[in-house]
Amino acid sequence: MEWKDIKGYEGHYQVSNTGEVYSIKSGKTLKHQIPKDGYHRIGLFKGGKGKTFQVHRLVAIHFCEGYEEGLVVDHKDGNKDNNLSTNLRWVTQKINVENQMSRGTLNVSKAQQIAKIKNQKPIIVISPDGIEKEYPSTKCACEELGLTRGKVTDVLKGHRIHHKGYTFRYKLNG
């Protein structure tokens, strides 16, 4: 097994080529969170601030050649639990989806239903000036404000604090 310091967290955390994440401070291997999408996640902390990372991306960033901006990580065998560096590769989103469809690991109709529901969910956008405005969907807000939908979604999920100075939250029912 090979270990490397996690970029941006040098001296705090390390990742192995097998998908383990180690805390130097505690001297322990950290337990992964596995949400409904099946991708292993890990929370890392530095300077009192926490950030969540997908384990397969950490492994690929540190052990797999070929990274370019915009590429995603593909599990060659389709098994999201297999985060060995030899099972991961950098591909385009299109190739990743094609691979998942050919393996039968992507439920297209379910993915479309989820995307449709999420895209129709009203959000509140807070401008850098603190002004709040409601939008019927993430898509509408992004189109009007010239924002990147993926980054806005990351803020809504708590993976980012803001995007281009804007913060976002889902509108509560009622």
Swiss-Prot record:
What are the UniProt keywords, alphabetically? Answer: Endonuclease, Hydrolase, Intron homing, Nuclease
Coiled-coil region(s): none
One Gene Ontology term of the molecular function aspect:
endonuclease activity
Is Nuclease given among the entry's keywords?
yes
Instruction: Indicate yes or no for the key word Hydrolase.
Output: yes
Top-level taxonomic group? Viruses
Supply the enzyme class, top level: hydrolase
Record InterPro entries: His-Me_finger_sf, HNH_nuc, I-HmuI_NUMOD-like, Intron_nuc_1_rpt, NUMOD4, WH-like_DNA-bd_sf
- UniProt cross-references to Pfam families, sorted A to Z: HNH_3, I-HmuI_NUMOD-like, NUMOD4
Quote the EC number: 3.1.-.-
GO terms under biological process: intron homing
> What is this protein's record name?
DNA endonuclease I-HmuI
Per the UniProt record, the source organism is Bacillus phage SP01
Question: Where is the organism placed in the taxonomic lineage, from the top?
Answer: Viruses, Duplodnaviria, Heunggongvirae, Uroviricota, Caudoviricetes
